[in-house]
Amino acid sequence: MSIIRFAFLACATLFSIHAAEQHLNVFIWSEYLPQDVAQEFEKRFACKLVIDVYEDAESMLAKVQGGGAYDIVVPPDYMVAAMVKEKLLTPLRLTNIPNFKNLDPKFRNPPFDPENKYTIAYQWGTVGVYARRKEGETLDESWSLFFDPQNQPGPIVLINSMRDLVGAALKYRGQTLNSTDTKQLKEVRDLLVDAKKRSVGFASSVAGKNKVLEKSARAAIVYSGEAGRGMEQDKETYYFIPKEGSQIWVDNLVILAKAPHRDLAEKFINFVLEPEIGAKISNYTQFTTPNAAAKKLIDPELLKNEAIYPGEETLKKLEFLKDLGRDTKLYDQLWTSIKSR
């Protein structure tokens, strides 16, 4: 009897160790998940959160297509349809995500994922310009700071993200972010090759923000949350949406089709949708929360900041990127041409 009991206890101990060593593999943008939130999830669910980061959506997709063994990734809205077509995602079991009820109705049933079959909105924001003030000089709030040599205010940084940068140049020329007109794209290529020669180089949104902070650049194309964190560090910096218009985006939590830990991944999504956790995330990232229940817990100073919570007039100037399907190859060719010249 004692041998049986010993064997049972040994098995129970091994099971306990195995459960404690369970891993959840998350592939996410850099500076997008607070450490205290990650630690709280690990403690509550007796697991290890393994976080890998990326700086642009295209590199994330390439790694996932190459067989990266992740559970959760965070693609932008326009990339979801392509991932579904390639059978890279597994459907969400919303019965396992009761906190879905906290999601703002504006982010339910999105056009890129009807009925939230595959996605839950994580954060949303804009693409714009982060710049340094200079006494006695007011910058023109225009994309011309980057694309017109006569209006360049000093050293500039171009965002190292194909759709974001090409979209900015298209907006400067008064065109849609989603143009597939070969003549327009050729003109944009020439514009960006010229801007590249005059810039301090390509950089991620985080790195671009840092160059403005360290004064090696006067202006950078960045995401709104990066600008919000930068403005907090240096009051002489600010963020604006150019008058020609720009991009609004939604990043989403998805579970990969080959996710090793699907159940734990759904627990993570449900955890993120808790009001307190959602607020912690957005107070840290300074991007806008899609969690209606979290909004009352957001720092009031952030809610007043139009760089993070844009007003109705600003929203009218913003456009979503769309999945271009086969025409994506036009952008791939364009990007290769820009980078190689």
List PLM regions with ranges.
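Early extracytoplasmic/lumenal segment of secretory-pathway proteins
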Residues: A20-E86
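Conserved C-terminal helix/tail region of periplasmic/extracytoplasmic solute-binding proteins
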Residues: E312-R341
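Periplasmic-binding protein-like
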Residues: N102, G125, L185-A195, Q233-A257, ...
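Mature extracytoplasmic/periplasmic domains
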Residues: L256-K316
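Extracytoplasmic ligand-binding site segments that recognize negatively charged/polar headgroups
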Residues: V64, V74-S216
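Ligand-binding "clamshell"
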Residues: V84-L92, D113-K117, R229-I241, L302-N305
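A bilobed periplasmic-binding-protein/Venus flytrap-type ligand-binding module shared by bacterial periplasmic
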Residues: G128-E135, K171-Y172, V250-L264, I269, ...
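A ligand-binding cleft/hinge motif common to bilobed small-molecule-binding domains
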Residues: M79-A82, L213, R218-E236
